[in-house]
Amino acid sequence: MSVLVVGSVALDSVETPFGKADEVLGGSGTFFSASASHFTDVQLVGVVGSDYPIDKLRELEQRNVDLSGIEKMDGASFRWRGRYRHDLNSAETLETHLGVFSQFQPKIPESFASPDFLFLANIDPRLQLNVLKQVKRPRLVACDTMNFWIESRRPELLELLGHVDLVTLNDGEARQLTEKTNLVQAAKWIMQRGPKHVVIKKGENGAFLFRQDNIFFAPAYPLENVFDPTGAGDAFAGGFIGYLARTGDLSETGMRRAMIYGSAMGSFAVERFSIERLMTVTHEEIEQRVRDFKQLVAFNEEMPG
């Protein structure tokens, strides 16, 4: 089954304690697509400026990512420059130049208008709502958001919650959105407003899946070397949604497996700058990492009672 993603396509310049990279592929749509393409066909909708090195995106086409939804506009592309110190959970933004992204009005090609799965990446909730008006209702609609939209577009974000099946956000954003300090209470608050599933990400501490009264925790993979955490959350989402699209299994068991595949893809993303590692990782490496995750939490001790 296909996945449609609407998100940013950017150029990132990143500094970490382990090196730096200039003008490399970035953006939520880019990271999601690179990750999800390991599982299913992906349709990407975004915008780039006339200065964007479009040839760099061609590698994604070879991985079953349809780029015909990328709009090219006159002007500068979206650029972000950030720095991570030894706390890799938070980036210091040094520069943000929205360029043509500030004028982005997603136009869904007719060939993309009946997706099986839809991921509304981190963009203005007004645009996310507009996308929903342009497509036939997918089997599953997921969205991401961030603190900026929670502060500046709260009414629209709350409206969006009534139209999606799944929300992904980090723990700080969950607390900010719901004004609840407890994440279990925060997830219930969100589900009361429409979504059936809530994924709360905690960076290097893993992620929670909330579904009805069930809670599942996926640990983060313990890596010795982390080069660039910039796209980890979007790579997680790509693995998660991509796996669901490949299997079509939206049961509790299917969702839990998808969480592990998402965590696996997020762990690969941080091993190199940009989408470099996501483009080279093999099917066998992905499956081995999933097996490693299972080993992380497996134990054979019989439980009393």
Across the structure, where does each feature detected by a protein language model lie?
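Conserved phosphate-binding/catalytic region of the ribokinase-like
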Residues: 183-305
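Alpha-helix C-terminal capping segments
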Residues: 33-42, 243-245
